[in-house]
Amino acid sequence: MGIKFAHLADVHLGYEQFNRSQRAEEFAKAFEDAIKICVDEKVDFIVIAGDLFNSSRPSPGTIKTAVKILQIPRDNNIPVFAIEGNHDRTQRGPSILHLLEDLGLLYVLGVRDEKVENEYLTSEKTKAGWLVKGMYKDVEIHGMKYMSAAWFEGNIELFKSMFRPEGDAILVLHQGVREITENNYPNYSSELSLSDLPKGYLYYALGHIHKRFELTYDDAPVVYPGSLERWDFGDYSLKLTWNGFQFKEEVGVDKGFYIVEDFKPRFIRINARDFIDVHIKGHSENEIKKAVKLAVPKIPRNSYVRFNIRWKRPVDVDWIKSIVNAEYVRVNPIIIKEERGPDGKDLDVKKFFTELEWKIIELASEKEYEYYLNQIIDLLASEEGKVEAKIDAKREEKKFVRPKNPGDIMAWVKG
């Protein structure tokens, strides 16, 4: 009889997107819907590849929600294996996931100070500490929490030596793979290359990228299921781009997770809030209004919509909001300045900035930029040699130079 499991990631419980509690409820409902499908599908176990929570310090209400939902698989004898992502990990010591483990709701994979042995977990001594691995019949589930690019740069051989499967095994990580992010999602950070992944696994269950993606490495699936709900307007269900005459329509990716049977993934779509991203660059007020009116019939009543209006003058934000019948409407008026160089020709300001810098400038210049702070932080974090990574690297270097004892080496990796 074959193996059947579910692969979820980036649940982000507690995320009050745009400061709206409604969105936190919808993120929770998406998780509950996914878990109930897992039960109906009679999966053997569930893998959560990082960021179950949107914060390492979730509110009591968010913890209560997680407990309620995770009781569903427990009551159906379905073990849940999870790792910490960049949002819900701690620098050192136990995380909120370990509390859920103590409650018998899930099993945390990764490096720890102490050996763990129970029905679904086993431990292996490594140079980093005790590598706690999941077990289900003859299949092992390996994984570790999110680590910075600086950590991988200094410890790639250690990483590969830790993960050497001897039989059927799954590797669970919450990282950006460079070949995937650079070619498909340049706004996401990457910490390692595809070739850095240890070989020999039958399935690579990844998290961190919020749009689903599949490829093959070493004859095995490498899969990002994406987030269960739409994370921002870049993760749109529909993008409308005005070309001066009509809108070009671009359909986004569905949201959901994977059911994996005999290590072959099958995508399961779940209902998610529609996000409509409208881009209009106009040459007159009449053209702007014409484009907005043509966009209105394409916008579902229950959707979240963002209008990006580029024009040389301010636009009537209230007028746009008054004619758009949607659950949530944002208008980002972006004034196009006519910059000219010394020769009198139009000056392309963008050429003085990298793609990443320009993206941050655009986000920070928006009227309601505070809603984009998380995205701006994520973009800044993706910069090579980021401040936090340098601090982490210095900490690691100190630990390797003067460890108090062998068990203290890389102590902050341990959960």
Swiss-Prot record:
Where in the chain are disulfide-linked cysteines found? none
Keywords assigned by UniProt, alphabetized = DNA damage, DNA repair, Endonuclease, Exonuclease, Hydrolase, Manganese, Metal-binding, Nuclease
Q: Which GO terms describe its molecular function?
A: 3'-5' exonuclease activity; DNA end binding; endonuclease activity; manganese ion binding; Y-form DNA binding
Q: Which InterPro entries match?
A: Calcineurin-like_PHP_ApaH, DNA_Repair-Maintenance_Comp, Metallo-depent_PP-like, Mre11_archaea-type, Mre11_dom, Mre11_N, Mre11_thermococcales
Task: Extract the HAMAP family matched here.
Answer: Mre11
Task: Tell me the subunit arrangement.
Answer: Homodimer. Forms a heterotetramer composed of two Mre11 subunits and two Rad50 subunits.
The record describes the protein's role as:
Part of the Rad50/Mre11 complex, which is involved in the early steps of DNA double-strand break (DSB) repair. The complex may facilitate opening of the processed DNA ends to aid in the recruitment of HerA and NurA. Mre11 binds to DSB ends and has both double-stranded 3'-5' exonuclease activity and single-stranded endonuclease activity.
This one is known as DNA double-strand break repair protein Mre11
